[in-house]
């Protein structure tokens, strides 16, 4: 891991390896009513722009059914998080679950990520937040030390709207690492042996 490019050595891993897939199915929460209002349109534009940025670097398939998605992007403010010094608010959050799913009569291990992006942000901050949280969802479960990187925990004065070269290198590296995700579930952890 020490020879990892970019900030690959700082990424968290699961016991199954990096939560990465060859192709990601993504669902984005549609507007509540048929026609999106101004605020919903702004949110959708920011999230879609962030998805388009990542789609230049890895295969993404947008799906209309959230049950088919590996990544679900939801329009809501993340709940407060309790830290040692008190409570902390955030603009976005990515929540990873490890799922056993049936595909073509096979049990596979897949990541399911719920991405929360607050609708109450300025347009550029919303897009930058979506870009950052989607980076986590696609396997970058860590942060860059560079404040002008989309994966920095706190960005500089201007919102970062595209993945950096370090982010690109790190993503390519993580996608080449061995992983149990997308593979048959090992018999010792299967929930149903039938």
List each model region and its residues.
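Post-HExxH zinc-binding segment in Zn-dependent metallohydrolases
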Residues: 150-182
């Amino acid at each position: 891991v020490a020879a990892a490019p970019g900030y690959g050595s700082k990424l968290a891993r699961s016991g199954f390896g990096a939560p990465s897939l060859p192709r990601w199915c993504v669902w984005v929460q549609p507007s509540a009513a048929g026609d999106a209002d101004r605020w919903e349109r702004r949110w959708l534009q920011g999230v879609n722009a962030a998805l388009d940025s990542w789609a230049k670097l890895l295969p993404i398939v947008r799906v209309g059914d959230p049950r088919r998605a590996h990544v679900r992007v939801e329009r809501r403010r993340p709940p407060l998080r309790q830290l040692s010094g008190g409570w902390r608010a955030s603009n976005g959050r990515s929540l990873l679950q490890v799922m056993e799913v049936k595909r073509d009569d096979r049990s596979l291990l897949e990541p399911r990520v719920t991405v929360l992006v607050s609708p109450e942000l300025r347009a550029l901050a919303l897009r930058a937040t979506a870009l950052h949280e989607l980076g986590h969802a696609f396997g970058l479960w860590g942060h860059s030390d560079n404040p002008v990187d989309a994966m920095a925990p706190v960005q500089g004065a201007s919102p970062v709207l595209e993945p950096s070269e370090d982010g690109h290198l790190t993503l390519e590296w993580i996608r080449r690492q061995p992983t149990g995700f997308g593979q048959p579930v090992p018999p010792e952890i299967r929930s149903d042996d039938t």
